[in-house]
Amino acid sequence: MNDMSRVERAVESKQTKMECRDCHVYYGDTHAIKNVNVDIADKTVTAFIGPSGCGKSTFLRCLNRMNDTIAGARVQGSFQLDGEDIYDKRVDPVQLRAKVGMVFQKPNPFPKSIYDNVAYGPRIHGLARNRAEMDEIVEKALRRGAIWDEVKDRLDAPGTGLSGGQQQRLCIARAIATEPEVLLMDEPCSALDPIATAQVEELIDELRQNYSVVIVTHSMQQAARVSQKTAFFHLGQLVEYGETGQIFTNPEDPRTESYITGRIG
């Protein structure tokens, strides 16, 4: 059995949203991601887990070409969204990031009003013809971000004035305002308290009804709670990928078991 046969365990059949093949990432001479092959299922939460420095965030950034913004980064391989190569020279990275949104580790609302934070992307992409349409887009995104009821009477207030948990939900609303197909989340709860974390986790479960969600997390408990599929990265390699319950209860690779049981990390 070759390495890919071990990684590509049988998983529940679901339409593939993104297909990644023979993927490598280099930072200068450093080979950060080594021959990763993975399919991201539609309307599913996929968790990337692994020790610090294992490459999970680097690989996540490949999925919407955020590594393009890092000096010296070089990406090789095939990354397809609905069968289309996202690294094709004809693809506009800005347009791609409207389809593949991202939420970062630390809440980063713009220094604008709550309304303008959410309206920012739709304005850039010309999604509203008038104020009424923009109002509808903003309300829909804030509702899906599970924060509408908390901010509907103060949309002109600065987004930076919200609590940490509210700011992160605002950033999620901002990311989904452009109606993406995939939502990437890089440690979205690491800066939040337990109550705010629970709110975001509940929101993630709701979001998968409409989007493919990929989340990087250092918390194995969080991965087990929110995801249906889990990928374990170690030293730049995808070691194992499969159904979350199977990965956590009966992993095939001893390195996965060692990480889950705390022997490596």
Swiss-Prot record:
It is an enzyme of class 7 (translocase). Signal peptide: none annotated. The keyword Translocase applies. CDD domains: ABC_PstB_phosphate_transporter. Residues 18-260 form the ABC transporter domain. GO terms for biological process: phosphate ion transmembrane transport. It is a peripheral membrane protein. One of its GO terms (molecular function) is ATP hydrolysis activity. Its EC number is 7.3.2.1. ATP binds at G50, P51, S52, G53, C54, G55, K56, S57. Keywords: ATP-binding, Cell inner membrane, Cell membrane, Membrane, Nucleotide-binding, Phosphate transport, Translocase, Transport. It is found in: Cell inner membrane. One of its GO terms (cellular component) is plasma membrane. It catalyses: phosphate(out) + ATP + H2O = ADP + 2 phosphate(in) + H(+). Its main location: membrane. The complex is composed of two ATP-binding proteins (PstB), two transmembrane proteins (PstC and PstA) and a solute-binding protein (PstS). Part of the ABC transporter complex PstSACB involved in phosphate import. Responsible for energy coupling to the transport system. Belongs to the ABC transporter superfamily. Phosphate importer (TC 3.A.1.7) family. This is Phosphate import ATP-binding protein PstB. The gene is pstB.
